[in-house]
Structure formats: C-alpha cells, structure tokens
Amino acid sequence: MGDVARGDGRLSHDLLPGEKGPQDECGVFGVWAPGEDVSRLTYFGIYALQHRGQESAGIATSDGEKILVYKDMGLVSQVFDDRALQSLKGHIAIGHTRYSTTGSSSWENAQPTLGPTASGTVALGHNGNLTNTRILMDLVRERFGKDLRGELGRGSSTDTAVVTALLGGRTAAGDRLEDVAMEVLPLLEGAFSLTFMDEHTLYAARDAHGVRPLVLGRLERGWAVASETAALDIVGATFVREVEPGELLIIDADGLRSRHFATPTPHGCVFEYVYLARPDTKIAGVSVNAARTEMGRALAREHPVEADLVIPTPESGTPAAIGYAQESGIPFAQGLVKNSYVGRTFIQPTDTIRQLGIRLKLNPLKEVIAGKRLVVVDDSIVRGNTQRALVRMLREAGAAEVHVRISSPPVKWPCFYGIDFATRAELIANGLSSEEVRASLGADSLGYISLDGMIEATTVPRERLCTACFTGSYPITIRDGATVSGADAPSVPDTGHAPVAGADTPGVPAEAVSGATPTPTTTGAPQ
C-alpha cells in the first residue's frame, strides 16, 4: 500500500491521553474525469464544502497505477498549495473536509483514509457516523488480529478507518472492489455518505435512510459526486440526481453503473435544511434557502412581537430573518458584522474556543441598533453560548429590547448520526422550559418555531425526515453498550424504534507509529 503524506512531511504523532474516537460531520467529493485536472476540481469541490468541516482536509488521486493521499490539519486553503496539487496526478480523485465531534482532532483521523486490498489500494471519505463500530471492529480483528493495517495501524480511531479496513481485508486476488462493497455496505449501521476509490474506479454509497446528502453530477468528460449540489455548481458539473438511499454507484471506463445493497427507507436529516447545508444547495429538490426563508415566515406567524428591526445572526440566520421580516412587516437590517475568517462556532472542538470565537466572529453596528427594539433571528440554539454572548453584546451596544426567535424547535436529544451535539447535558433546552432558556440567555422574549412549522417549510413529508434531535425518535437502531462522549446516553421514550442505551462511535484503540514521508509518493502495491 502507498504512503500517506501530510504537509509537514510527518507520518504520525501520538494522540493525547484519554481522547475518544471521533464522529464526523463532513463534506465529501469525488470525480472521475480522464483528461481533466481532477486534483484541482476536487480542491474547488471541497473548498465549496468547507462549511461542513474546518479541522482537516485531504485529497486522494489515482493515475491508474497508484493512489496518493495528501491530507493535513487546517482549512482547504491552508492544506493545499499549487505544488501539492501538481503532485496529485490522475483521472480519479476524492476529497474530504472534516471536523471531530468528540475526542481527538488529529492528523491520524484526517481523511481520506487509505488501506491495502489484495491487488492494490482503497481510499475512502465518509460523512456521517456509524452506530455499530464495535461490531465492525470485531470483524476487522477476526481478519487481522493485532496486525492492523492501513490507517488503523497508523493510529486512526475513526469508524471511517474501520470501513476502509473491512473493504480492503475482505478482498482476495481477482476480487472486484465493487463486489466486496456489496458485501460490506449492508453490514454498516448508522448514517453514511461515502466516496471511495481504487486505482481504476470511483464509488459513491449512501445509507439506506439517506440521512446525509449525496448527489451526482455530470462533467463534460466525466462524473462528479458531492455532499451538496452547490459543490457541483462550483466545479461546473450539471446536477443529475441524488444518490439514492441504499445505492452504490460505480464509475469507471465502462461508464456509470448502479447497484442497491439495501431497501430505501428515507429519513433525511432535517438539520441539513436548518443549518448544515449551504443556502445555495438543493436537497431532495428543495432549495435550502427557500426552506429557511419559509421557516422565518412561519416563525413570524407563530411568535409575533412589536419591534423596530429584524436582524439575523449572520449568516446562517439570514434567510429566516428575511422571511420573518417579510411576514411581519418589520424592517430588516444588518445589525451585526461577521468576521468571515472565523470558523462556525457550532463546528469548533471545545467550549473555550467556541466562547472566544463568538466575540471574534460577531460585532454589533451600534448606529443601527442603538435605541431599537430588536428581533434577533437565528437558526438554532444548541448550547446557548452564541445567543447568550450575543444578547449581552446587543444590550451593551444600546439595544432597547432583544427578542430572540429561532427557526428550529428546541434541540433536546443527542445526534448519533454525525452532528456535534453528542450528549443531552450539552443541550441548553434539555430539562429547561423555554422561559428558563430565555432567562439564561438574558433576552426579553424567546420563540421557537414549532416542529410542524419547520417540517412544512421544507415541503418534505414528515415520514421522510429524521427529527431525532428534536423529538427523540431515532430512525436507526442505536446499539447497546455504545457511549456518547464517554458516558452512557439517556434512555429514549418508546417511539417504535430500538431505545437508546447509549450511542456513539466507540473509540478504536489508536496505536501511534513513528516514521516520516518526506515526499508524497506511493507504490500502489499492497502491504
């Protein structure tokens, strides 16, 4: 198997003691396009998906003989320069942006992951989170024992590395990765949108529930797959369709093929419409911007208030604020200036960084808000850190009243499918009434959109959405014995699905290795 390069030439470093295996809410991209500069297309593709993860980025390419993975910690623009992109030759590429939601944010856990097969190499990127990683890891150990290969051998502790090991470990001489994938994918439980590749073929797969988005696009000389349609737009690909839940796409010199490894039971994540996806993306044919604007209109109908201005928490709250202003007749204004060079506070690994980031990220326009009664519209309240600091800043800037309006219901339940609220203890709405949350924030009033109002704004049938973070009804079984952030998750009321006895991707023991690769080269041969 080939080496994996990082920007500083190092191959590995030790994880901090006590760190747990992370989950991912990430962006994935893939391209098959002979004659195109696939590394640059992928660079632009994952740049368009930067909002989905800002801790690490990586690209893998194949020229038909060998696979090279180049990845490092940091933003896409920090990881890759012209020299790095020029070194990534080939006609197939996959790319990935990542953030960790529990535990280590380290180079070993950056993606794409790389692993040996019987006849070459597989590279893989993953958006989502698996709920049966312990069972899958047992299968890996049955195959390899303590001789863990690929990213697991280098110290990775992600469910992604486990899937990569399963794909590689189940191949025998002459096997097609396509056929092996059809055996492995049904074993995976949880949420996953995958892009992976061997030396000759690009693959894309989506779990049977379609929790995380994944779309297919057509290039002039090939194909592209991405987490969001906006990434297809950026690289000049024409949207073809969504990858169906339970579908595996295979793209090679023979064209595009489709196989189904599971019966589709769609439950797309509603939080994609609320916050995660770009507003210029479409999910299930629905404009995210239009859905958010309609959420704002519904919010104004459900929670009217006398005020002078409607201002958004930029930029994720802007479409809903516009909708609120349109429906209420209250003038819309930009009362807050956002520093675009500060990452999303929701997608930062520790509360300390989040708190500092809020002050760096937003600054009030005093001349706009002084003496005004404000409606401040935001997309969600998770921990409450942003809104609490924001209310304080607005009052210090002279706001007469601050009325907070939220275009999603209270987040009361942890997400086990790849979003960064892993325990109920982290959620401000858990155990508190709306009035108690209002008092905690220091706002004059607080209004959340209803569950019905939010769902209706998406125009997607309720039964095709996952609303577990709002309702506690989980569409995918959470395996007993799993944990969230090292602690058992709370029990979940009977909702027709298996109760949660605690869930999270369990930590895979990381065995860090020493060594260095001064230049990003590969052999393409199995270990």
What are these regions (language model features)?
Residues K146-D147, A173, P304-D308, Q326-A333, ...:
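Secondary-structure transition/capping motifs at alpha-helix termini
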